[in-house]
Design a protein with these regions (language model features):
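Cysteine endopeptidase catalytic domains of the caspase/legumain-like
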Residues: 1-302
């Protein structure tokens, strides 16, 4: 009997040992599963962060290519040789330089210099016909400009300016150009106007009642940039012996516009800052002005 009791106790002890071993194994398995679940949770959070970053980049890229659906086309004019108001020194070269830079950036260029009234209106009409829906459009004008009754006009080389009505007939309305681009369905229009915003007729004693270019309002999908603030002179040169052949605004613009992956907002912040400093260095004031209704980003060199 005693022998049988000993055997039974041994069996029960082995049973307890097996149960404890199994429990320990189950605990280890549970801990491993818990660790795996925690690792999976962290991996899920990491993947979610990556997905959010990818979605943010996609959204940014979509904004950057908002205006990339169409072609890139530019209308560039530089008028130096005015017949009845003061001649300019650098407008023609400014237009040529900007035209070359835009060509390098992938734009189809329509470049014109020293246009009289007839030629300027014909060139504008031809350019309007080229613009297609979704195009990125850049309009660059270097020359004289004036405003009458709050309306901005870009002046051809043979402008007379004997009276306001004559200027309205002979000059080109800036707003008309912008309206034409909108009518043609341009995806984005950037107007760069490197013109004095004082009165070019003042020294000639003409009583036209006009003053420098007026503040304006861009419509959706357009950005308008004046090289100088209202009533300011856009400097051709910093001083008579200035060795740089381009006007102050254009020389800075040329340096900034071809920096890769630089948005127009960043370009213009840099341009404005440097133009202000350059003008200040010779005791002048010139502050580029921007009127912006663009949607998304524009890059000269994406």
């Amino acid at each position: 009997m005693e022998r049988l009791k000993d055997q039974l106790n041994q069996v029960n002890a082995q049973k307890n040992d097996i149960t404890q071993g199994e429990l320990a194994q189950l605990r280890r398995q549970a801990e491993q599963k818990e660790q795996a679940a925690e690792a999976a949770k962290k991996e899920m959070e990491r993947l979610k962060d990556q997905l959010n970053q990818v979605n943010a980049q996609i959204k940014k890229d979509e904004n950057q290519i908002t205006y990339r659906a169409g072609r890139r086309i530019a209308f560039v004019v530089g008028n130096n040789h005015y017949q009845n108001v003061s001649r300019l020194e650098t407008a023609k070269l400014d237009a040529i330089s900007v035209g070359n830079a835009l060509k390098e950036a992938g734009f189809k260029i329509n470049l014109h210099t020293d246009l009289n009234e007839k030629s300027m209106k014909l060139a504008m009409r031809d350019f309007k016909a080229q613009v297609q829906k979704g195009d990125e459009v850049v309009v660059f004008f270097a020359g004289h400009g004036v405003q009458i009754g709050g309306v901005n006009y870009l002046l051809p080389t043979d402008i007379q300016g004997d009276n306001e009505e004559q200027i309205r007939d002979e000059a080109i309305q800036l707003q008309r150009i912008l309206d034409d681009m909108q009518d043609r369905g341009a995806g984005f229009t950037l107007a760069l106007i490197d013109a004095c915003r004082d009165n070019p007729f003042r020294q000639q004693g003409r009583s036209i009642g006009g003053r420098g270019l007026a503040p304006t309002t861009a419509t959706t999908g357009q950005m308008i940039i004046f090289s100088a603030g209202s009533g300011q002179q856009a400097l051709d040169k910093l001083y008579p012996t200035d060795p740089v052949p381009n006007g102050v605004f254009t020389r800075v613009l040329l340096r900034e516009m071809l920096k890769p992956k630089t948005s127009i907002d960043r370009v213009m912040r840099n341009v404005r800052q440097d133009v202000v400093q350059l003008a200040k260095s010779v005791g002048k004031e010139q502050t580029p002005a921007l009127y912006d209704q663009a949607v998304g980003d524009f890059y000269f060199k994406p």
